[in-house]
Amino acid sequence: MFRWAIIFAVIALIASLLGFGGVAGLSKDFAVILLVIAVILAVIGFISRGRT
């Protein structure tokens, strides 16, 4: 999931450099959402591993 977040962040960067504001904003939003979900799942995984 971190890989997809990085991919969308790179797409947003390239789109913003080329002047595609809408695509850049949408890609940035997807990257942020995926990054937050990945961090939450990682924290849940670390907590659940510690209890077993």
From Swiss-Prot:
GO terms for cellular component: plasma membrane. It comes from the Bacteria. Its main location: membrane. InterPro entries: DUF1328 (IPR009760). It is a multi-pass membrane protein. The keyword Membrane applies. Keywords: Cell membrane, Membrane, Transmembrane, Transmembrane helix. The chain crosses the membrane at residues 6-26, 30-50. It is found in: Cell membrane. Belongs to the UPF0391 family. This is UPF0391 membrane protein A1S_3910. It comes from Acinetobacter baumannii (strain ATCC 17978 / DSM 105126 / CIP 53.77 / LMG 1025 / NCDC KC755 / 5377).
